[in-house]
Amino acid sequence: MADEATRRVVSEIPVLKTNAGPRDRELWVQRLKEEYQSLIRYVENNKNSDNDWFRLESNKEGTRWFGKCWYIHDFLKYEFDIEFEIPITYPTTAPEIAVPELDGKTAKMYRGGKICLTDHFKPLWARNVPKFGLAHLMALGLGPWLAVEVPDLIQKGVIQHKEKCSQ
């Protein structure tokens, strides 16, 4: 997987038990409860370790998720909208997170602003179905992607802090 710190963070995220997706009706409701419990625990753990970096909410059915994530670089906060839909084959298929604001600004992204997770994250997800959920997607997918891509985009001048842009 990754370094020891990442392993520790992931070990503190509750694993999920219900193997269900949106078309499984009653089982999907149970899976959503587990997803929310896992996300809440992950966010609480992040806040307790002064590493709060995203907010997520969903539509009523739990099939469309949206929110914000942020990355601190040189004491400046870079904030981005995020969105994803739960695939009909979830949890076998991991959701594809989109950061629309960064669409076309990095090679590690597909059309529509969907971040590239194929090489590192998707094989890990596949080995851990149905135990991994949305909290794991954030911790092992979006978090590391932001940590690599945002500083690189800043260094190349592709993105600038909003305060610097308004001056």
Swiss-Prot record:
Protein name per UniProt: Ubiquitin-fold modifier-conjugating enzyme 1
Source organism per UniProt: Mus musculus (Mouse)
Post-translational modification: Ufmylated at Lys-122. Deufmylated by UFSP1.
Function: E2-like enzyme which specifically catalyzes the second step in ufmylation. Accepts the ubiquitin-like modifier UFM1 from the E1 enzyme UBA5 and forms an intermediate with UFM1 via a thioester linkage. Ufmylation is involved in various processes, such as ribosome recycling, response to DNA damage, interferon response or reticulophagy (also called ER-phagy).
The organism's taxonomic lineage, starting at the top: Eukaryota, Metazoa, Chordata, Craniata, Vertebrata
InterPro entries: UBQ-conjugating_enzyme/RWD, Ufc1
Cross-link (Glycyl lysine isopeptide (Lys-Gly) (interchain with G-Cter in UFM1)), chain numbering: K122
Active-site positions on this chain: C116
A GO molecular function held by the record: UFM1 conjugating enzyme activity
